[in-house]
Structures are given as C-alpha cells and as structure tokens.
Regions:
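Pre-Walker A-like glycine/lysine-rich segment at the N-terminus of P-loop NTPase domains
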Residues: 1-45
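Short strand-coil-strand connectors
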Residues: 11-17, 82-86, 114
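Polar low-complexity intrinsically disordered regions enriched in Ser/Thr and small residues
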Residues: 37, 69-70, 131
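Extended, charged alpha-helical "arm/stalk" segments used for dimerization and assembly
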Residues: 27, 87-136
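Short solvent-exposed loop/turn micro-motifs enriched in small/polar/acidic residues
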Residues: 13, 71-74, 103-104
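Conserved P-loop NTP-binding catalytic core
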Residues: 30-31, 41-99, 109
Length: 136
C-alpha cells in the first residue's frame, strides 16, 4: 500500500485556530522556534496514532488562548491522503465535556473516514499501519 500525505487541516489544534497545509512530493516546513512546526507533525501522529511528534502517547492538543484551553469548540486534525491513487480523508475530532459542577472534564474522540463515522478499531485498521513499525 502506498500512502502519500496531500493536506492537513487543523481546527482549534495547539497553536492553530484554523489552518490548512498542502503537501507535495517535497515539502519544506521552516519557521522560527515556537511557531508551530512540531504542531504540524503532532497533528499527523495524533490523528493516526494518538501521539505527538516525539511519539509520546495522548498529547495535549487543545489550543489555548491566554493560558486557558478553548473548550467551546472541537479540536480536530484532518488528513487528506492519497492511498494507492485514491483520495481518502481521515479525521480525528475531540469534544470536551464538563461535569455538572464544572470540576472535571472528559475528552471524547470521534473518528471519520471520508466523513463516515468509524470506531477506533476500524479507523486504526483502515491503513493497516502498525504503530510499533512506525516508531522504528
């Protein structure tokens, strides 16, 4: 299976309120420190493997403004891929809900392939990429 990244679309993700990045056969990402380069790599890994660019599990990806998380909207990473010549859109979205007294919260992840809701198991199985192999 040949997989090529065509685009990443980010919503409320780390330092990005909304941003789209197009990828080509060769794409260079360059910027000053702290401007979001690692966030782009984390968006890819978080969507597919629930880890950051350093392969640490379950990273905090919700955008913050003034040191406070933006909770009133979902956080998402959408990958537009070319899989064996066919365009495939894979999306992971995270919704935050608070307890009634506001003392705790829960982040629920939802997964989509070509806008069709999927279970985590089906989402992970779609590309057949093993995270342990990816880490090598």
């Amino acid at each position: 299976m040949k997989i090529k990244l065509l685009k990443i679309i980010l919503e409320n993700f780390m330092c990005y309120a909304h941003e789209e990045f197009d990828f080509f056969d060769l794409t260079k990402i360059a910027a000053m420190n702290g401007k979001g380069k690692s966030s782009i790599a984390t968006a890819y890994n978080w969507c597919l493997f629930n880890c950051d660019y350093e392969l640490k599990d379950n990273p905090v990806v919700r955008r913050e403004v003034g040191g406070k998380p933006v909770d009133d909207m979902d956080t998402s990473s959408t990958l537009v891929l070319d899989v064996d010549g066919k365009e495939v859109i894979m999306k992971k979205a995270q919704k935050r809900t608070y307890s009634k007294d506001g003392s705790s919260y829960k982040d629920d992840n939802k997964y989509f392939i070509n806008d069709v809701p999927k279970t985590l198991k089906d989402f992970n199985a779609y590309l057949g990429v093993d995270m342990n192999v990816f880490k090598m």
